[in-house]
Amino acid sequence: MNALAAADEVIIPVQAEYFALEGLGHLSKTVEMIRRNLNPQLAIRGVLLTMYDSRTNLAREVEQEVRTHFPATFRTVIPRSVRLAEAPSHGEPITVYDPSSTGARAYEELANELIERLRERDLIPAVAPMRPRATVTTPPSEVAHGA
């Protein structure tokens, strides 16, 4: 609650599962309580669907419910992905662990969508969308010689 009391905005991640809808309802009420009592500027900037498996009816139903009740839901959804699950165990973000994975691409899309929303509110100047970073490697000869 302290983080919400100090924040200007919150992004709520929601797993595409039934009980997550219940949790989203509770968290929305908590945000509203904090807005009334502690932080009138607190805003839900968006809801992010995560662990989304488009092959299941449940995920699609949860998505429909979330989008119906929370119009600020991000277009981007984060898919359920083995590579996303593996990355933390290797101590790396997905954009380093497997930059070409669907999860990495989804997070890059989310970053671009956030930038777009900030631009629409004139909070940042117009910028180019994120592009995958080039991998820079130091040739072995430079590593050995400390160049």
Locations of regions flagged by a protein language model:
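C-terminal alpha-helix
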Residues: 109-121
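Conserved catalytic-core segment of NTP-binding enzymes
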Residues: 1-82
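Short, polar/charged, Gly/Pro-enriched helix-capping and turn/loop motifs at alpha-helix termini
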Residues: 41, 121-125
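Short aromatic-enriched loop/helix-cap "lid" or pocket-rim segments at secondary-structure transitions
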Residues: 58-60, 87-90
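Short, contiguous clusters of charged residues that form electrostatic/catalytic patches at enzyme active sites
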Residues: 25, 29, 105-112
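C-terminal boundary of histidine-terminating zinc-finger modules
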Residues: 88-109
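Long, low-complexity intrinsically disordered regions
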Residues: 124-144
